[in-house]
């Protein structure tokens, strides 16, 4: 992949993220704040952006979104890495990971 292709992919990801964020915020702000990991002020700003502003923001060369999962424990739980593959175990691991990520969202708010 060339650097131009990579930049085009980043811009497309930015546009997709911004459009999804606006849709979620406009449908249910409280749920969007939780799912996107944003505070209410950022959600209000995103919801109020015009199409031209969204396109301008999306054209940046850096990703506007980031992974919420930033530690090995959550990644291991989500991927069942280094654990036996059992349905009940996977469900428990996913639940545990969701609880950990939800607690981190409350820290942002």
Swiss-Prot record:
Which regions form coiled coils? none
Superkingdom as given in the UniProt entry: Bacteria
Q: Which GO terms describe its molecular function?
A: DNA binding
Return the InterPro entries for the record.
Flagellar_FlhD (IPR023559), FlhD_sf (IPR036194)
* GO terms for biological process, alphabetical: bacterial-type flagellum assembly; positive regulation of DNA-templated transcription; regulation of bacterial-type flagellum assembly
Q: Which UniProt keywords apply?
A: Activator, Bacterial flagellum biogenesis, Cytoplasm, Disulfide bond, DNA-binding, Transcription, Transcription regulation
**What is one cellular component GO term in this UniProt entry?**
cytoplasm
Assembly information from the UniProt record = Homodimer; disulfide-linked. Forms a heterohexamer composed of two FlhC and four FlhD subunits. Each FlhC binds a FlhD dimer, forming a heterotrimer, and a hexamer assembles by dimerization of two heterotrimers.
Function of the molecule: Functions in complex with FlhC as a master transcriptional regulator that regulates transcription of several flagellar and non-flagellar operons by binding to their promoter region. Activates expression of class 2 flagellar genes, including fliA, which is a flagellum-specific sigma factor that turns on the class 3 genes. Also regulates genes whose products function in a variety of physiological pathways.
Q: What is this protein called?
A: Flagellar transcriptional regulator FlhD
């Amino acid at each position: 992949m060339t650097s131009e292709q990579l930049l085009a992919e980043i811009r497309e990801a930015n546009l997709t993220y911004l459009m999804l964020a606006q849709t979620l915020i406009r449908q249910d702000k409280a749920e969007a704040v939780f799912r996107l990991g944003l505070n209410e002020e950022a959600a209000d700003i995103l919801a109020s952006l015009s199409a031209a502003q969204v396109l301008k923001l999306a054209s940046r060369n850096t990703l506007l979104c980031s992974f919420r999962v930033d530690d090995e424990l959550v990644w291991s739980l989500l991927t069942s890495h280094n654990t036996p593959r059992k349905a009940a175990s996977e469900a428990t691991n996913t639940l545990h990971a969701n609880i950990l990520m939800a607690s981190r969202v409350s820290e942002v708010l």
